[in-house]
Curated annotation (Swiss-Prot):
It comes from Staphylococcus saprophyticus subsp. saprophyticus (strain ATCC 15305 / DSM 20229 / NCIMB 8711 / NCTC 7292 / S-41). It is an enzyme of class 2 (transferase). PANTHER family: HPR KINASE_PHOSPHORYLASE, PROTEIN YJDM-RELATED. The active site is at 136, 157, 175 (proton acceptor), 241. Its EC number is 2.7.11.-, 2.7.4.-. Residues 262-267 are annotated as: Important for the catalytic mechanism of dephosphorylation. It comes from the Bacteria. Belongs to the HPrK/P family. HAMAP family: HPr_kinase. This is HPr kinase/phosphorylase.
Amino acid sequence: MLTTQSLVERFKLEVITGEAGLNKQIKNTDISRPGLEMAGYFSHYASDRIQLLGTTELSFYNLLPDEERKGRMRKLCRPETPAIIVTRDLEPPEELIEAAKENETPLITSTIATTQLMSRLTTFLEHELARTTSLHGVLVDVYGVGVLITGDSGIGKSETALELIKRGHRLVADDNVEIREISKDELTGRAPKLIEHLLEIRGLGIINVMTLFGAGSILTEKRLRLNIHLENWHKEKLYDRVGLNEETLRILDTEITKKTIPVRPGRNVAVIIEVAAMNYRLNIMGINTAEEFNERLNAEILRNGNHSEGNNQ
């Protein structure tokens, strides 16, 4: 549960009053700058959001008649409001301090500029309040691409990850990957604290990757871009040999590119994953070798067809 207290500690904010409300839960990632509310319009006041008061809001408030000030601040401070933050180290009005104290609404000050603080708070809240799920697999950073390796138990996911680590890539999580949907089409993965930096190898046991290979071999968190699904080779199954078939893996409401790699003796899966990651980066840059080959093949078929028609005439 994310509370106002954790926000104060994270951004080193100063609490002026309303300490009793520091345990309030923050449920909304949106942040408000109550400009219209300062003017007296509270019909659509989003009171469950964190409220930011900067130079603009307080300058307007100071222009209000004395008889309106107290009522305006009482309407602003609601029991469900997680916090009111005054930015730029500005002095909170006395009416605001009194209203916050009455309603046990945390009144906080910050030295940071309003826009900058709003951006930092939004990023933090989106990360902390994001939808989460867990998947069985291994997450590795390969050439800057977050690769989620999945497959049946015993297929060789951890062994493949170990080979990738030896080749200079970085482990994020093994066995259990905690995934957050930060925003639309953006997933990040990390390891649970209990198994952070650990890798399980059958017959060998649990190893500490950071201790064995150094700090450069691990990564705390990585955005998921590519799913490599390992499965035993089936003779009757037709595998993609050109690269035109586009598979996706849906996690929460986001889809990522998926490649199914058949596993059998003699195949170096780690190298295949390296190439898959590099090829994915090329695709993002607009270079698709499979499509180029397909266009070249179609052009050759068309040329041969026209040549045959000419000979028949």
